[in-house]
Amino acid sequence: MNIQRRDFLISGATALAAAGLPRMARCAEGCCAGPFKTVLKKALIRKRLTPDVVKVLKDNGYPGVELQDKSVTEAEARAARRLAEDEGLRIHSFMGGWLDFNAKDPAKRRDAIEAGKKNLRLASAYGASVILVVPGRVGGIPMPRPSAFKLAYDPKTLMLSRAADADFPAYVQAQNDATKYAQDAVCELVPLASELGVTIGLENVWNNLWVKPDFAAAFIRSFKNAWVKSYLDLGNHERYAPAQEWVRALGDQIVKLHIKDFKLDRAAKNEGAFVRIGDGSIDFKAVRRALECVGYSGWVSIESSGWTDAEHSAIMDRFFSGKL
């Protein structure tokens, strides 16, 4: 760990105070059963905001949208923000996507950081409060199957010593490198995020990193900074641990949510597959209780297919009320 990152990680008292003390990360099953006090808001994901997209949102009861197009100019992003505001809608998040913070080539790591800065500026122009960032990925090396991961790591340094009962030294090294490089990169992005008022939401998207709830939560909390949080996808992690366990572990570090469903099949290559919301293995009633327990109020973007926008809207209403 270099001195700059070490000092950043251990001197975040001001930001930590601003963020407040963590809520209890665990809660008993059966608590928070309702009526719910937390308020969830539904959003669609679209590439750009156009009049046609505005109509879809308003016709189907979506007050917000998450946008994806990184090729727009800041002027175009500001125009989209004006369109949304004129229609009583909110561009709540900007999907910055994959950033190759752990590339072996230092030039590529630098490019990823600069791309992150550009995306932060676009998010600000859109009026989004959060930018979604996937902070690296690993692949092409031997690693455990999803259900076989048993991580052992130093809670202070987050360095992994074991990935599973069997030995996977290449994976352990890759995970440790990814943690260090991601910490370096995100720490460099934080000053701009703070200046712009845009939170960096770190998400796992089948990137084979931070694969257990406690480890992912420790990684997010290592920054000790209010501008670095978790963008949790409720479907991406089911093959590693139930979605409600991810919610409880991440707790008040969750800044935004994606929703999709996943059908477990431990004999399959990926131990399952994505399916329509409601057709999979996720216990959405337990997830809703967990969100209430950790006090999450905020946006939930649909990242799923198989239903119409109107059907998804009705499904979200059922999820929000704890009836899905």
Where are each of the predicted segments found?
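Conserved, mostly hydrophobic/aromatic
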Residues: 57, 65, 84, 112, ...
